[in-house]
């Protein structure tokens, strides 16, 4: 099994979109190295601390699996009852989408932080995981 890891150098912007409003076959477009257009409203998510975004690719006998992970802290509560995809813009200006119109959808883990007495901010800690044949696909906003 061969494993590679892509880590974004820094996250400048995070936004969410409803999966149902995305174009079809994002994973296949990503494999073909075609940037995906995001033709719907992107809801910006304010964040604090340092978000992280990475994608681990495993190739095992011709089977490819990407696992993208996005971690960030925000004051905003996202609409968790809907299937959401995330548009991440790195500090180099390149944008990527995590998620697709079709299953599997990203899994959102939410932790509530009440902050510390020493001044750490209170808020919501999100960990988004998306496992597909291609995740963290370049996109146009």
Predicted segments — roles?
Residues 71-101:
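Short, acidic/charged, Gly/Pro-enriched secondary-structure junctions
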Residues 4, 60, 86-88, 126:
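Homeobox/homeodomain signature
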Residues 21, 75-77, 93-95, 105, ...:
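Generic "edge-of-domain/loop-turn" microfeature
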Residues 103-141:
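Mixed-charge, glycine-accented linear interaction segment located at domain edges/termini
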Residues 54-76, 120-134:
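Oligomerization/assembly interface segments of phage tail-like spikes and tubes
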Residues 1-67, 104-118:
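Solvent-exposed edge beta-strands and adjacent loop segments
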């Amino acid at each position: 099994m061969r494993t590679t890891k892509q880590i974004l150098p820094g996250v400048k912007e995070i936004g969410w979109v409803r999966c149902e409003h995305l174009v079809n076959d994002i994973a296949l477009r990503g494999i073909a190295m075609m940037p995906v257009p995001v033709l719907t409203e992107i809801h910006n998510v304010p964040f604090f601390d340092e978000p992280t975004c990475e994608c681990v690719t495993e190739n095992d006998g011709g089977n490819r699996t990407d696992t993208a992970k996005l971690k960030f802290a925000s004051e905003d509560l996202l609409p968790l009852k809907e299937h959401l995809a995330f548009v991440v813009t790195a500090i180099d200006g390149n944008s990527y989408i995590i998620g697709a119109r079709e299953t599997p959808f990203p899994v959102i883990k939410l932790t509530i932080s009440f902050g510390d007495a020493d001044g750490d901010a209170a808020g919501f800690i999100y960990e988004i995981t998306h496992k597909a044949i291609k995740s963290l696909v370049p996109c146009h906003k």
